[in-house]
Amino acid sequence: MVAACSAYAAVNVATQWAGTRTGIPSVIIAFWQYVIALVLTLPLLVRDGTRALRTSHFGLHVMRVALAAAGVQVWIYALTHVPIWQVVALSMTSPFFVILCARLFLQEKVTPARLLTTFTGFIGALIIIAPWSDSYTVYSLLPILAAALWAGYSVMTKYLTRFEKPASISAYMLVLLTPINAALWLASGLSMSAITAPDVEIWSILIVIGAFTALAQYFQTAAYSIADAVYLQPFDDLRLPINVIFGWIVFAAAPSINFWPGAALIIGASLYLMRQDSGTSRTA
């Protein structure tokens, strides 16, 4: 999991570099990121054959992946306008959105402890955004929007597990994400020719982003295959300090003073939530 967090941090740094230093539009970054990742993971799909694509809920798969694609687009756009440390910290509000979505759409029970945890997490996000400060911009809300979209994706994934096999759910994620990102790119009207950076620099950074995306997903899947999610959660939270370190090394960008108390509230609420869920599972 630590390797996965490090790989994702490399993706975030490379994505911010591509958007701010190379001038590649976010829709183009998103498209090539997952095309390259798909190519690198294609051998795994070929191994399972067309069996993984058999489904009677194709429409739900499309809706689920569309939410994921929208989250990716918003995430990458945020990385071109907001410091890495802020983007990553605010994205960690996703579990709290999952609680709200699960209550609204899956009718799952929400305990007072979960409500308090959710409220605490959002207070942490508010402290990081600091809408009362002069440095606040509307771009600061983008990571929260991405977190909400990914929460919708997670809830739909959980719903699909009632009918679909994990292999089918994973396969459709990879297969559908590329055409959806392609459609968003075409709708934007942008082209590769609009990028003024040298081709070598453009393709080098895009390949790095795609390769580390595939690597991060592999490490993450491997981690969840050998350990429980509750055990891995503290290691997953390491992505925040790892991203802060990477961002500081590459961009010399240090977090603001608001970051630390806000991040502490978000991580603390997340860990408490995981501990509560672990206790509930053992009781059941």
Curated annotation (Swiss-Prot):
Keyword check for Oxidoreductase: no
Bilayer topology term: Multi-pass membrane protein
Subcellular location as annotated: Cell membrane
InterPro entries for the chain: EamA_dom
Induction, per UniProt: Negatively regulated by riboflavin, probably via an FMN riboswitch.
This protein's record includes keyword Transcription regulation: no
EamA domain span: 2-129, 141-273
GO CC term (a single one): plasma membrane
Sequence intervals crossing the membrane: 26-46, 58-78, 82-102, 115-135, 136-156, 167-187, 195-215, 247-267
Chief site of localization: membrane
Alphabetical list of Pfam families matching this protein: EamA (PF00892)
Keywords annotated in UniProt: Cell membrane, Membrane, Repeat, Transmembrane, Transmembrane helix, Transport
Family designation: Belongs to the drug/metabolite transporter (DMT) superfamily. 10 TMS drug/metabolite exporter (DME) (TC 2.A.7.3) family.
Function noted in UniProt: Transports riboflavin into the cell.
Name by which UniProt lists this protein: Riboflavin transporter
Source species of the chain: Brucella anthropi (strain ATCC 49188 / DSM 6882 / CCUG 24695 / JCM 21032 / LMG 3331 / NBRC 15819 / NCTC 12168 / Alc 37) (Ochrobactrum anthropi)
